[in-house]
Amino acid sequence: MAVERRTVGIGYLRWLRDLWVRRDNRWVRRYNRTAPKLLCIHSHEGAWNAYNPAGPYYGSLQMDSSFMWAYGADKLAKYGGRDARYWTARDQLAVGFRAVRARGFTPWPNTARACGLL
């Protein structure tokens, strides 16, 4: 059975490129606004592999297990249920972005005040 090939016009390809550029720009703008704020929280909370046994809180954003399940269940599955101190910095920031989108900076009240975010 032969596969029919369709040619795509240059207009469609330009439209598709522009669509992806617009979507990418929207994400970049959102990232550029939030990333420095999360990095400020990171600088106050600890290293990427930080562990606070008194909490227990894990990772540089000091996430507890309920926080990780709420905003990073896919990351928990990716790392086989291991806590955030074993996650990459990129994965920890991705979970932080989700939390900021949902709740603002309230999960880190004292640190957010120190960073001037609350």
Language-model features and meaning:
Residues 1-34:
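Cell-wall glycan-active module
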Residues 27-118:
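Peptidoglycan cell-wall recognition and remodeling modules
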